[in-house]
């Protein structure tokens, strides 16, 4: 039996810190799913995103008990042939956070997503044969000068058409 590729378009953001921007919905209108890498900041933001598209998320260090009840600290799942792991505080290739390095080394996913640093980073880890994405921060809280999000396509386990979206102000 031939399994057809789904070709999913993913909208990825992090560190909204309770900040809503209508641009989230605008830029993610073509996406099949929205993923959030933590520090959502409010239940309202999570609910707005979840009402808009199928929504996967993790909680971050600033998220309160309500959000921690709604989402896990680590979200590991497989979608269109790609195993994905999302954790808010995760580090990046060459400098993974001690809290996740064991999982990454033992069973590396194809895609590891983290947030927390407010620094946009897309880097391939050759050692683990794994792509790492930190979409930067979409909210207003923090030192970052530019608010960013990411869109990409998963096609039969491969990642392509990655776009960085810069939000004004």
Q: What are the residue ranges of the model-derived segments?
A:
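Short, solvent-exposed coil/turn elements at secondary-structure transition points
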Residues: 16, 61, 90-92, 138, ...
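Short, solvent-exposed aromatic-acidic interface loops
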Residues: 162-169
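Active-site-proximal segments of metal-dependent phosphoesterases and phosphodiesterases across multiple
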Residues: 63-108, 140-143
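Active-site neighborhood of phospho(di)ester-bond hydrolases with catalytic His/Asp-centered motifs
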Residues: 12-14, 33-39, 56-61, 86-88, ...
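Conserved beta-sheet core of the metallophosphoesterase superfamily
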Residues: 56, 95-158
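Hydrophobic anchor at the start of a short beta-strand
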Residues: 55, 84, 162
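N-terminal active-site segment of His-dependent metallophosphoesterases
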Residues: 2-55, 63-81, 145-148, 154
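Short active-site segment of divalent metal-dependent hydrolases/proteases
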Residues: 18, 42, 91, 119, ...
């Amino acid at each position: 039996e031939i399994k057809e590729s789904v070709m999913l378009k993913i909208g990825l953001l992090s560190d909204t810190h309770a900040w809503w921007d209508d641009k989230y919905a605008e830029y993610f209108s073509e996406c099949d799913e929205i993923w959030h890498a933590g520090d959502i900041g409010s239940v309202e933001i999570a609910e707005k995103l979840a009402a808009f598209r199928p929504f996967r998320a993790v909680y971050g260090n600033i998220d309160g008990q309500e959000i921690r009840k709604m989402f896990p600290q680590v979200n590991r799942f497989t979608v269109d042939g790609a195993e994905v792991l999302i954790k808010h505080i995760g580090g990046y290739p060459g400098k993974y956070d001690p809290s996740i390095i064991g999982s990454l080394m033992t069973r590396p996913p194809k895609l590891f997503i983290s947030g927390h640093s407010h620094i946009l980073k897309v880097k391939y880890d050759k050692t683990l044969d794994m792509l790492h994405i930190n979409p930067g921060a979409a909210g207003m809280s923090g030192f970052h000068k530019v608010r960013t999000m990411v869109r990409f396509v998963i096609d039969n386990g491969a990642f392509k058409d990655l776009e960085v979206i810069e939000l004004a102000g």
